[in-house]
Swiss-Prot record:
Family of the protein in this entry: Belongs to the WD repeat ARPC1 family.
Pfam families associated with the record: WD40
Species name: Arabidopsis thaliana (Mouse-ear cress)
Name of this protein: Actin-related protein 2/3 complex subunit 1A
InterPro entries: ARPC1, WD40/YVTN_repeat-like_dom_sf, WD40_repeat_dom_sf, WD40_rpt
Length: 378
């Protein structure tokens, strides 16, 4: 089993992020607060801080690895940057200028900017103005036709990928004069204006979620609500796109383990492994959880029996339903909505990652003992 630690912190978890040294985790227990826990032992976590500033549910958290700052966003349309001063976390309000909820947030690789996706069909690019001692929000208003569900920074700190409930994945330039430095190479992202769309992908016919870049920035992956995952190589005027369909429930988020391997998590409550072969063709490999070994036919039969039993109130059918639900995943009991790397930024391989979900659990997964099982792609 790849799981090394599982702990239930709340009834439900909206999002989570780790401190630079991985000794603390910040999470939202599906309310207006952010709780910070420190691991004292494998089975014991102590709550050190409760960050209270937002008025509505916290929808996004990211913890910078270099500056040790926490950024949070909420349905209240605001963002806070938290700095540790002594033993207290001090918030700085960032006015996003949104008229709808903020849905997700991520620090840029250089941590001089962060991006916020929103329900206002816009993306906020926020940066710090030293002269005025405040955070400024610049809006990318073009193109999006619906809520922006996820954002992902390219390693070059300029390109930003987004997904939306309009089913599209887009790549924008976020170059800001005075914040970003120009690349001497011709055709670099710095030569494009702020907010200019570089690419639009119309691969999904349903909501799109969980966009991520590979460690090198050469490949882009995101998921659709129709149980599809999409891979895009050579992002630019002539991209190469692949679609992989699977028969189980849709995914919500993905993480590149290496250039040729991706972990997907979502409504099936069990991480899924996708890998690329030597010819560059992506495919589904396996589930990480051991208890997914039950045959699909018996699983679907058990689900039908469960629904049939609930309809007629049969007690005997509910026993079969419990057995079926346990076989679908031995770690999480509900949708996994977040997956976070536990490796250093820029690392070519991710050996550890964490997941959190609507069951209130945070699970830590270790892939070191699974290299032979996962194959050469790892």
């Amino acid at each position: 089993m790849a799981v090394v630690d599982v702990h239930r912190f709340a009834e439900s978890i909206t999002c989570h992020a780790w401190s630079p040294d991985l000794s603390m985790v910040a999470l939202c227990p599906n309310n207006t607060e952010v709780h910070i826990y420190k691991s004292l032992s494998q089975d014991h976590w102590e709550r050190l801080h409760v960050l209270q500033k937002h008025d509505q549910i916290v929808s996004g958290i990211d913890w910078s690895s270099k500056s040790n700052k926490i950024v949070t966003v909420s349905h209240d349309r605001n963002s806070y940057v938290w700095s540790l001063e002594g033993a207290e976390w001090v918030p700085t309000l960032v006015i996003l200028r949104l008229n709808r909820a903020a849905l997700c947030v991520q620090w840029s690789p250089k941590e001089n900017k962060f991006a916020v996706g929103s329900g206002a069909k816009t993306v906020c690019i926020c940066y710090y103005e030293q002269e005025n001692n405040w955070w400024v929000s610049k809006l990318i208003r073009k193109r999006h036709e619906s809520s922006v569900t996820s954002v992902a920074w390219h390693p070059n700190n300029v390109l930003l990928a987004t997904t939306s409930t309009d089913g599209k994945c887009r790549v924008f330039s976020t170059f800001i004069k005075g914040v970003d430095t120009k690349d001497s190479k011709a055709g670099s992202p710095a030569e494009t204006k702020f907010g200019e769309q570089i690419l639009q992908l119309d691969l999904s016919y349903s909501w799109a979620f969980g966009v991520k870049w590979s460690p090198s920035g050469n490949t882009l992956a995101y998921v659709g609500h129709s149980s599809m995952i999409y891979f895009v190589d050579d992002v630019g005027p002539s991209p190469l796109a692949q679609s992989v369909a699977f028969r189980d429930l849709p995914l919500r988020d993905v993480l590149f383990i290496s250039e040729k391997m991706v972990i997907g998590v979502g409504y099936d409550s069990n991480p899924m492994v996708f890998a690329s072969d030597d010819t560059g063709i992506w495919s589904f490999i396996r589930y990480i959880g051991e208890k997914k070994a039950a045959s699909s036919n018996s699983s679907y039969s058990s689900q039908f029996s469960e629904a049939f039993g609930k309809f007629y109130g049969s007690q005997s059918k509910s026993t079969t339903a419990n057995d079926a639900s346990e076989s679908r995943g031995g770690v999480h009991d509900n949708c996994i909505n977040s997956i976070v790397s536990l490796s250093k930024a820029g690392s070519p391989k991710v050996m550890r990652f964490s997941t959190s979900g609507l069951d209130g659990k945070v699970a830590i997964w270790d892939l070191e003992n699974m290299e032979q099982e996962l194959g050469n792609q790892f």
